[in-house]
Amino acid sequence: MKLLVILLFSGLITGFRSDSSSSLPPKLLLVSFDGFRADYLNNYEFPHLQNFIKEGVLVEHVKNVFITKTFPNHYSIVTGLYEESHGIVANSMYDAVTKKHFSDSNDKDPFWWNEAVPIWVTNQLQENRSSAAAMWPGTDVPIHNTISSYFMNYNSSVSFEERLNNITMWLNNSNPPVTFATLYWEEPDASGHKYGPEDKENMSRVLKKIDDLIGDLVQKLKMLGLWENLNVIITSDHGMTQCSQDRLINLDVCIDHSYYTLIDLSPVAAILPKINRTEVYNRLKNCSSHMNVYLKEDIPNRFYYQHNDRIQPIILVADEGWTIVLNESSQKCDHGYDNSLPSMHPFLAAHGPAFHKGYKHSTINIVDIYPMMCHILGLKPHPNNGTFGHTKCLLVDQWCINLPEAIAIVIGSLLVLTMLTCLIIIMQNRLSVPRPFSRLQLQEDDDDPLIG
């Protein structure tokens, strides 16, 4: 009976494992389409992306980090760290000690990036490996005195086709081989700000173009013979929500601009007081019922957004769809809001020898992507905030079981064991059934005559 149980569970475990061994070194391409909101997948048609998912895995929601902006979340993907830990805490920053400023047009100083070690640096430092990058934030900066062997300086006017051609050329023909590569594209974020997720007509056109680019990516990889052995992750940094001229929070109505310096604006405004901090806070805290005002030490723990000098003394967080302004104008749509909001979440899809086929998973954290990528590449991860266990179900070489599967396996196992037990009992009963009645056998003393 014990042997049967051991064999049963050995079979179950074996069924969840797959041989992913290969003589080729593992390779990984990480692709980001900026501002790709998770539910775009449900609301629009993506034939090329759906084919990609059908042969790979899909994570329906990736919970990103606060604040839900481009630079911070792209750095969280490749470091596995919260913003307070990796130091890229916003798209616009100020360091009070060095008096330095950071922005999307002034981002090349390694000072801002050196609080963490991104995966392309770790990979680049390995023997017989190199990294490549097509405009992923930070990849054109020497971080810890290391830069990828192959990279493109950021230029938004460079086409997706040119970026793709460079990346595939480097993946296909480099020495030492490129084993980790990144590719970044500004859409659908740029159009999302302009039109918004509720503009079906325009966003349908924009997202069709995105899907066509994914089709071009897959076709290019197949044409160059990279498709079968290359692991590809397609994801994003954040989503998008609709804003309105009717939902504005005008700071000039609440406080004189001479009292503070505005480091970053909506929907999370970073305030550096010029006068007493408490006075500035008191003037702002009742400014709008649609905005939370926090002293730095009171920022909710769930944001992991306190412990860094680049986080300003006062933070303003607008409600979803509301915009913090200094005048009456605003863009139609934005991101950066509370990272618990589904509208802020991106998705993740992946394909390749490291991943299952046709598997869907509900949610992971954006910081979980880093330890998963390190595992795929065989790299030792730096200390991080991610949890590798959250992504095990995506990978063919990992034992993984979620709650519904666990319940199904337990019930199935009990049914099988019950059937086996019943079968054994039936067989034992058959062997111990009494033989049919036979003629009475006389003992030796029964042969004596009854009458002497």
Curated annotation (Swiss-Prot):
Molecular function GO labels: bis(5'-adenosyl)-triphosphatase activity; metal ion binding
Glycosylation: residue positions: 155, 166, 276
Any Gene Ontology CC annotation: plasma membrane
Residues forming the catalytic site: 70
Cofactor: Zn(2+)
Sites where the protein binds Zn(2+) 1: 34, 70, 237-238
Compartment list: Cell membrane
Protein topology in the membrane: Single-pass type I membrane protein
Disulphides: 254-287, 393-400
Keywords: Blood coagulation, Cell membrane, Disulfide bond, Glycoprotein, Hemostasis, Hydrolase, Membrane, Metal-binding, Signal, Transmembrane, Transmembrane helix, Zinc
Catalytic activity annotation: P(1),P(3)-bis(5'-adenosyl) triphosphate + H2O = AMP + ADP + 2 H(+)
Stretch forming the signal peptide: 1-15
Transmembrane segments: 407-427
Cofactor binding note from Swiss-Prot or TrEMBL: Binds 2 Zn(2+) ions per subunit.
Ligand binding (Zn(2+) 2): 189, 193, 335
InterPro entries registered for this protein in UniProt: Alkaline_phosphatase_core_sf, Phosphodiest/P_Trfase
EC number(s) given by UniProt: 3.6.1.29
SUPFAM superfamilies assigned: Alkaline phosphatase-like
Chain ranges on the Extracellular side, renumbered to this chain: 16-406
Residues involved in substrate binding: 91, 154, 189
GO term, biological process aspect, one: purine ribonucleoside catabolic process
Gene3D superfamilies per the UniProt record, alphabetical: 3.30.1360.180, Alkaline Phosphatase, subunit A
PANTHER family: BIS(5'-ADENOSYL)-TRIPHOSPHATASE ENPP4 (PTHR10151:SF79), ECTONUCLEOTIDE PYROPHOSPHATASE/PHOSPHODIESTERASE (PTHR10151)
Family stated for the protein in its record: Belongs to the nucleotide pyrophosphatase/phosphodiesterase family.
Protein name in UniProt: Bis(5'-adenosyl)-triphosphatase ENPP4
Annotated source species: Pongo abelii
High-level lineage: Eukaryota, Metazoa, Chordata, Craniata, Vertebrata
